[in-house]
């Protein structure tokens, strides 16, 4: 079992029990799991960590759990998130001059619209995507207050956005992939969504050991190895991948990765 994302049968094999026994365990214990449609999926790393620590709560990857968390923190998300990276990511993206007035941009895991609102004046339109209705409500409220009229919202799972292939000129995932069970799936979806010649823009933490941050912000991943992420982008089909570092308030390290389709 070398692969990271496991089926029910593979997870049961990892535990060394029958599928029937594993289903019973799944019902009675807080086994880290995620339900996609009718199918259960399990992170191998999360299962091993859960087994060794005995604490599954911080590894809970259920879609409902994540949605509930972000719905709850939506009104204070701006204050909470800015305490970690302030305006540095938005300012860096503007400084990099990668957007233009002809672009339609999709912002995945947009939250309260930190990036969507920040780049709105630079592009034709932003489609802001998030699973949390409360986050999108905050975005619309703040956009209206600022007189922003070219940001549309879409409440859906970012791994399976209901849009046609090659729909947008650029797709962003700002401080979002560390919330995902399988970032590679998300990167492949980004490749599907963006037009040939378009760009994907990701910002995220480098690998860190700040468990307090992980638990407070409901993170799944404690940052990423930049070279590993570059491999994921290349495997999805992206090319011309470039990385720049950004300063953050906690000195963990944030990178911005830009890739061409």
Where are the regions that the model predicts?
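A short glycine-rich, Lys/Arg-flanked "PGG" loop and its adjoining helix->strand segment in the class I
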Residues: 184-199
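Conserved class I S-adenosyl-L-methionine
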Residues: 60-100, 114-115, 138, 145, ...
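Class I SAM-dependent methyltransferase SAM/SAH-binding core
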Residues: 106, 112-160
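Major-groove DNA-recognition helix of helix-turn-helix-type DNA-binding domains
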Residues: 16-40
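A short, Lys/Arg-enriched interface patch at domain edges and termini
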Residues: 45-65
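C-terminal alpha-helical "lid/dimerization" subdomain adjacent to the S-adenosyl-L-methionine
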Residues: 78-81, 201-258
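A conserved beta-strand element that flanks and buttresses the S-adenosyl-L-methionine
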Residues: 172
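Polyanion-binding surface elements
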Residues: 1-21
């Amino acid at each position: 079992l070398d692969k990271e994302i496991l089926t029910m049968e593979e997870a049961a094999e990892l535990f060394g029990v029958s599928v029937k026994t594993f289903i019973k365990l799944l019902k009675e214990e807080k086994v880290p799991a995620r339900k996609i449609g009718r199918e259960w999926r399990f992170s191998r790393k999360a299962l091993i960590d859960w087994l060794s620590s005995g604490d599954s709560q911080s590894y809970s990857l259920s879609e409902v759990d994540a949605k509930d968390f972000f719905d709850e923190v939506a009104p204070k998300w701006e204050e909470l998130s800015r305490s970690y990276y302030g305006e540095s990511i938005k300012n860096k993206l503007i400084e990099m001059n990668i957007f233009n007035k002809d672009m339609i941009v999709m912002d995945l895991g947009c939250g309260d619209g930190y990036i969507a609102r920040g780049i709105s004046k630079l592009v034709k339109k932003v489609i802001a995507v998030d699973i949390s209705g409360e986050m999108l409500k905050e975005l619309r409220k703040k956009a209206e207050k600022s007189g922003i009229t070219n940001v549309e919202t879409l409440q859906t799972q970012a791994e399976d956005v209901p849009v046609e292939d090659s729909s947008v000129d650029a797709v962003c995932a700002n401080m979002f992939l560390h919330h995902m069970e399988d970032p590679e799936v998300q990167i492949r979806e980004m490749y599907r969504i963006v037009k040939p010649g378009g760009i994907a823009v990701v910002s995220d933490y480098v690998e860190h050991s700040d468990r307090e941050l992980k638990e407070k912000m409901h993170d799944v991943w404690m940052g990423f190895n930049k070279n590993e992420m570059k491999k994921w982008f290349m495997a999805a089909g992206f090319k011309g991948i470039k990385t720049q570092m950004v300063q953050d308030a906690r000195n963990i390290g944030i990178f911005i990765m830009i890739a061409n389709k």
